[in-house]
């Protein structure tokens, strides 16, 4: 599949995996929407939607930075409409935005619990919902969720139940929408790269050895 001229709508695209997906697509001449909350520099995490847009264009693509909170339905609707107005369509929806807290049940603050479910599950569902009518107009449409394989082994739930529950809602969106949308020729897939453990957001919530800790606690795609 050639990405030249294709429009990617990427949530959480200001840094990390989302930005890397955008940059790789840009090398093939894609048009990349960077839809994320970070418009101003974060004290601990590098990158904004505007610096990300510069990187996309440097890689050879076209960029459209949009401030987006995936929890806000009006914001999501308007972001999709802005994309259509600017680029004329959407070919690929990448649900990358996610919240993480690798904490036990007693140590999980309910505000953090709610945030993870609002962003991971509801946000993925909401963004997909508004992209689908436009994906139906594409001749090679895809939805890609940054989500793990559904593995019901207790070991994936025990250490950080709230996060696993929230993240698996994204995985269930893959299974459900793949079945729902197959008659519309919209492919729906999940991507769970091992490199996800090296993103700055993950490093904020793990110590003293974030890479090793997450590698031992995340389900693999094998």
Predicted features by range, described:
Residues 6, 61-62, 89-90, 135-149, ...:
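Active-site loop of short-chain dehydrogenase/reductase
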Residues 28, 86-87, 103-104, 130-139, ...:
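A short helix-coil junction within the Rossmann-fold of NAD(P)-dependent oxidoreductases
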Residues 104-105, 109-114:
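Substrate-binding pocket helix/loop in short-chain dehydrogenase/reductase
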